[in-house]
A protein has these predicted regions:
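Short amphipathic alpha-helix used as the core "switch/output" element in two-component signaling
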Residues: 41, 63-75, 92
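Two-component/phosphorelay signaling modules centered on CheY-like receiver
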Residues: 11-31
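Receiver (REC) domain active-site loop signature in two-component systems and cognate sites
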Residues: 57
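Active-site residues of response regulator receiver
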Residues: 54, 82
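Helix N-cap/capping motif at the beta->alpha junctions
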Residues: 32-41, 62
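Flexible nucleotide-interacting loop at or near the entrance of a catalytic core
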Residues: 110-136
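Active-site beta3 strand of CheY-like receiver
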Residues: 46-52
Length: 136
């Protein structure tokens, strides 16, 4: 079961994301944080397979959260969400290693596909690393 952290300050959006991704057939375990500070604290304490993160949040915004996380964890996939979708923010988040950038309100099929693809890529990278160690 993949463990996903949703960091979103807007409660109605967070509730929708949790409901969609915690569908009984999804195979996802969901945790949530209402701001960037709570999100970074959870990332430090627990292991996640994916982070779904809003960009504009109080205390610590999504870009800063991504930057801080990348200092200690370069492999944790991030999907960035924003209601203020501009190209500069998308480019900045992708340069920092975000897997995807999705405008709010998200197209649900696109969101689910992006989550599944990010998790699949993470799994393949992990398998590749293990195989390389066996060969070496």
């Amino acid at each position: 079961m993949s463990k996903i952290l949703i960091i979103e300050d807007e409660e109605p959006i967070r509730r929708v994301l949790v409901r969609i991704l915690s569908d009984e057939d999804s195979g996802f375990e969901i945790q949530e944080a209402s701001d960037g500070k709570k999100g970074i604290d959870l990332i430090k304490k627990e292991s996640f397979d994916l982070v779904l993160c809003d960009i504009k949040m109080p205390k610590i915004d999504g870009i800063e959260l991504l930057q801080r996380t990348r200092k200690t964890n370069t492999s944790l996939p991030f999907i960035m969400l924003t209601g203020h979708g501009n190209i500069e923010t998308a480019v900045e988040s992708m340069k920092l290693g975000a897997y995807d950038f999705i405008s709010k309100p998200p197209d649900l099929n696109r969101l689910i596909n992006s989550v599944r693809n990010a998790l699949e890529k993470k799994e393949l990278v992990t398998e590749n690393k293990i195989l390389r160690q066996k060969v070496a």
